[in-house]
Amino acid sequence: MTHAHITSWLITVILFFIAVSLQRSGASKAKIVQMALRLFYIFTVITGGLLLHSIASISILYIIKAIVGLWLIGAMEMVLSGMKKGKNTNVAWIQWIVAFVLVLFLGFMLPLGFDLF
């Protein structure tokens, strides 16, 4: 399940940057990519929930990682909706960067992730 989750969030991040670039260029395909992105949000949340459920003794860090992961998805939506409305998205980008760094750090630090830290 770990590999499914990693694949899911990796595709989610790639689709997010594709959606951002399509949104900036004003392409008509941006809506289709955003719908695929939302589908991968669901895959990421489900696989993350299944991973969380499979842990025998849940540390508070796993709960924090899940919350930060949901925050990251929210920041992605804030960036995309702000761009669509033509608003300033600097705060949303800062939130996205902070959440992304935190979720990567927690994901690689905890025992279910890869041993980078």
From Swiss-Prot:
Record keyword Cell membrane present: yes
Q: Where in the cell is it found?
A: Cell membrane
Where is the major localization of this protein? membrane
Q: Which Pfam families match?
A: DUF1516
Q: How does it sit in the membrane?
A: Multi-pass membrane protein
Spell out the InterPro entries in the cross-references. UPF0344
The alphabetized UniProt keywords are: Cell membrane, Membrane, Transmembrane, Transmembrane helix
Q: Where are the transmembrane segments?
A: 2-22, 32-52, 55-75, 97-117
- Recorded GO CC terms: plasma membrane
User: Do you know which HAMAP family this protein is assigned to?
Assistant: UPF0344 (MF_01536)
Cite the NCBIfam families for this sequence: PRK13673.1-3 (NF010196)
The record's comment on protein family reads: Belongs to the UPF0344 family.
Q: What is this protein called?
A: UPF0344 protein GWCH70_0687
| Organism this protein belongs to | Geobacillus sp. (strain WCH70)
